[in-house]
Regions:
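Short active-site-proximal "capping" loops at secondary-structure junctions
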Residues: 24, 95-99, 268
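Structured, solvent-exposed hinge/loop segments at the ends of secondary-structure elements
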Residues: 31, 35-166, 170-175, 231, ...
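A short amphipathic helical element positioned immediately N-terminal to and/or at the very start
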Residues: 2-13
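Amphipathic alpha-helical recognition patches that constitute DNA-binding helices
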Residues: 5, 20, 29, 33, ...
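Mid-to-C-terminal secondary-structure elements
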Residues: 119-135, 149-274
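Short, strongly hydrophobic transmembrane alpha-helices
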Residues: 13-40
């Protein structure tokens, strides 16, 4: 009966009925697209296992009042984290995708050119995030010329642990990097999922202490209070500055400039202050 009435109305008011149907279809499509986008936004970086315990180390932005910066030198963050029992892992790592890097590899008598989106990290930085290796691992990554690549890239270019990639096209540079690990791709949506490989940042001893350029992340024990950890980290840094012989005036400036906060990984996507 309902179908019969619908057909009757459709025949009598064809144009208006079709417009209503089209309008409702567009409305439902819009609602669907909005719900997909909302779900995407709300799950961003939360899809990373243990993301609720991972934080980015930040300090007040010196150029914009009320905002925060996440660039650090290679030395201070480790001093801040030293001896804090709630910290399971910590280190410098870039989890944002950079430009693709040109590589080349010689196979038999041919040279293949590849492009891989690379980031950089120190081994301790990689340990903050839940890398799952299908081949190799982080043991050899500590070597100066060790790199790790994603499983997707390994399959795309038919690469394996032990292969040497030359930086640049057509073997021009002669500078080789050794693939020491192949990891499972991280789930999306997340920043880290866009990175296809990591190269070792190199030794802290060779890094300039006044070079504030690298992000630093920490992973806390389950149930740990990041606010309490912040207090301990700040206390560690103040003690280190005192040992360096900083004056009261210098200490006041440094505390104001570098009092830290731990920004949850799951909230960074929406954070407009950093």
């Amino acid at each position: 009966m309902y179908i019969k009435n619908f057909i009757t109305l459709l025949k009598r008011y064809t144009t208006s009925s079709l417009l209503n149907i089209i309008g409702m279809s567009v409305a439902f499509a819009a609602i669907y697209l909005i719900s997909v986008q909302v779900r995407y936004d709300l799950s961003y970086d939360k899809v990373i296992p243990n993301s609720e315990n991972i934080y980015r180390l930040e300090s007040p932005n010196r150029y914009e009042e009320g905002k925060w910066s996440y660039h650090w030198n290679r030395q201070w963050p480790d001093e801040m984290c030293s001896g804090v029992p709630e910290i399971e892992a910590s280190g410098s790592i870039w989890i944002y995708a950079a430009d693709a890097v040109d590589f080349s590899i010689k196979r038999n008598q041919t040279v293949d050119n590849l492009k891989i989106v690379m980031s950089s990290a120190e081994p301790e930085g990689l340990e903050v995030f839940p890398f799952e290796f299908v081949e190799g691992g982080l043991e050899e990554f500590r070597l100066a010329k060790g790199i790790i690549i994603s499983e997707e890239i390994a399959k795309k270019y038919n690469l394996k642990v032990g292969d040497f990639l030359t930086v640049g096209r057509s073997l021009e540079s002669g500078y080789e990097l050794n693939i020491v690990g192949i990891f499972k791709n991280f789930p999306e949506p997340s920043n880290i999922s866009a990175c296809e490989g990591w190269i070792n940042m190199g030794s802290q001893q060779n890094a300039q202490i006044n070079n504030f350029n690298d992000p630093y992340y920490v992973r806390l024990n389950e149930g740990a209070s990041h606010v309490e950890v912040e207090k301990k980290m700040n206390a560690n840094m103040i003690e280190a500055w005192k040992k360096e012989g900083k004056s009261e005036e210098e200490l006041e400036h440094l505390v104001k400039r570098y009092t830290v906060r731990l920004n949850p990984l799951s909230k960074i996507y929406f954070d407009e202050l950093s």
